[in-house]
């Protein structure tokens, strides 16, 4: 977990790889998360049938992941921005594709996301995901700046 701030806005980023223990892992970190948390994970599982090139029924693991994400008030940011897109993050040697890498965020924080996209990678069987935020650069007036008092400039005759 990385905690910090971007343009004076708190953010926490959690990276997870836990295909066998999805529910337990999310439950364990629930106390560490808040509305500023972004979870980046490879669960080796899709969340919706649309996330696979081969249309299969939703299995129990998929349903458990979907239920757990809902219980934590999280949202699949990529699916929220691209509800009908058939883009994939993983390609198998069998010629099938799936979106098994996810970026989850709190539902109330969705307005802070500018865009998200899947970027092709030629060096891996997983594509990269890019997330841009709406953090605006804040102009802060430096209170330590010295200023000349203009009354000293009056000429006395």
Q: How would you name each of these model-derived features?
A:
Residues 1-157:
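A shared catalytic/ligand-binding motif for oxyanion handling
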């Amino acid at each position: 977990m990385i905690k910090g701030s971007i343009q004076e806005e708190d953010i926490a980023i959690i990276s997870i790889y836990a295909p066998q223990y999805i529910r337990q892992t999310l439950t364990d970190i629930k106390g560490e998360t808040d509305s500023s948390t972004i979870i980046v994970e490879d669960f080796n599982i899709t969340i919706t049938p649309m996330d696979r090139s081969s249309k299969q029924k939703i299995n129990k693991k998929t349903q458990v992941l979907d239920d757990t994400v809902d219980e934590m008030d999280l949202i699949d940011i990529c699916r929220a921005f691209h509800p009908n897109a058939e883009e994939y993050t993983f390609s198998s040697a069998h010629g099938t594709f799936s979106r098994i890498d996810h970026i989850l965020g709190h539902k109330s924080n969705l307005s802070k996301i500018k865009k998200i996209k899947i970027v092709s990678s030629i060096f891996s069987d997983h594509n990269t995901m890019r997330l841009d935020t709406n953090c605006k650069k804040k102009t802060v007036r430096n209170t330590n700046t010295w200023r000349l008092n203009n009354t000293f400039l009056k000429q006395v005759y």
